[in-house]
Amino acid sequence: MNLYDKAHELARVLKDCPEVVELRNTSVKMKENEDNLKMLKDFRQLQYEAYYEQLNNEKISEETETKLNKLGSIIAMNKTVSNYLEAESRFAVIWEDLIKILNEAVDVDLSFESKK
């Protein structure tokens, strides 16, 4: 079996794994409601702002933190959005693990940074 056959085999297994099925199903439900999509978009924007603030100031502003907590509480009460975010998180763990396994198999340092 060649590399591409194995890649297709992995794709088939991935397609049917419970975490991917759940992400797919919750994604469909999310797309059925514009308010949920807007809530998710707003949450993502706030997450980005918090990340940016943390990078530049080493701390998230009180205002951003309050907004995140407020929207997070609202999302926690919205089953569709919270289920989607949970499914996305579970999938992200699997995806990161797969990428790590593949990177370890390739075993090539592509950073080209000088090491001191």
UniProtKB/Swiss-Prot annotation:
**InterPro entries in the record:** Com_YlbF (IPR010368), YheA/YmcA-like_dom_sf (IPR023378)
Per its UniProt record, what SUPFAM superfamilies does this chain match?
YheA/YmcA-like
Q: Which HAMAP family match?
A: UPF0342
Q: Which family does it belong to?
A: Belongs to the UPF0342 family.
Under which name does UniProt file this protein?
A: UPF0342 protein CTC_01059
Q: Which organism is it from?
A: Clostridium tetani (strain Massachusetts / E88)
